Amino acid sequence: MNRLLIDIVCVSFLLFFSCKEENLLQPYGGNENSIPTPVSNVQVKNIPGGAVLYYDLPKDPDLLSVKAIYTATNGSQQTVSASAYVDSLKIVGLGNTNDYKVTLFTVNHMEKISSPVEVTITPQVPPVQRVFESLDYSVDFGGFVVSYDNDTESEVAIYILRQDSTGNEMEYYDALYTKSKQGNYPVRGLPNKENQFGIYVRDRYENTSDTILFTETPMREDLLDKSLFTSMKVAGDVGWNFYSGDPTYAWDDKVSNTNYAHTDFPVEFPHRFTMDLGVTVKLSRFRFWQRPGDEVIYQHGAPKHYKVYGRAEKPEAGSASDPFAGWTLLMECHSVKPSNLPLGQFSSEDVEFISKGEEFSFPRDIPNVRYLRFEMQESWSGMKCSTIGELAFWGEIQ
């Protein structure tokens, strides 16, 4: 019995060490010497900043992919691959409308490549240039507003330059990173004095536009002193003292989950409150911070839609049946959630967005005001309450 067991063990060892070890990382295929057939009938569809190449695939069961090689605008060699299950590939990121030579190869599972097929593409006007040609600006409070169109919805950066203190160099001041189809970007924080500015566009492929240079004087803009703010009670206003909340917490320079204004609960919408800014001002913009916290941002009582009214004279007691007699509607505000994720879900971009405060610019033609009245019309969750983390206002004090 012992002899039989020893024989079995010996045979097992011999079989184990006689097995050839297979390297699963090596290329594999039907014939290691075969060269794949190239693509045929290549058709070119030029697009902004690139092209889509359509082709007929060879009838080769060992085909792995199609590879395109070309030299990008910045001189670097680029490679784009498409699987054997699709009959096209896309080239993007070219920065002009020059002709570009593209070389196509097929690749099999043994990583053998076919003979080359060369085609020429002529990209349409690239996104970086299309955005640049659409740029416009208008002088505004504390700076200017840059408008742009981005019809291809490409990822671009719009850079803002200003002349430095020596007057000899242009320096970086601000940038907008976007893939929105169009937009207006306010450039803020600039002094009320003449200076030279520049705007240019760049994309993720290092393509850069020319620079628009202009000389302007931004309008004066003051950050309003929150120590002058006071709350008021006008007919039709709701209480803002629920769960240790207080209306003055909305302008105490503290943004926390334990320091916020909270309406009584539950109270049917709309929810109104009135405040005195302490000065008469031509408002330019304001910033609204939601109550922070994972369980409340873009939910609970975070306002989704609301209106802002103003007036210069101190309001009388008013009437609940006519709550806005003597008030001017300054703007309607619609809170934005960048990710558009469902209720209770949010992205890091959402958190970053609201942590900076959601900013709203007042129309240029609004009257001078001292008193403001907010009317909350809907919360993000539908709950019958409203909360405010913090408010800040800018404008030209009269």
Positions of predicted regions on the chain:
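C-terminal motif of bacterial Sec signal peptides marking the signal peptidase cleavage site
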Residues: L15-S18
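Surface-exposed loops/turns
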Residues: I47, N96-T97, P191-N192, V279, ...
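Recognizes extended acidic, P/S/T-rich segments that occur
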Residues: L57, P61-T97, S115, L161-N192, ...
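Beta-strand-rich modules
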Residues: L64, L89-V117, G183-P218
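Preference for solvent-exposed, low-hydrophobicity sequence contexts
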Residues: R162-Y185, Q196, Y200-N241
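Aromatic, loop-rich ligand-recognition surfaces of beta-strand-rich domains
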Residues: K254-F324, K356-Q398
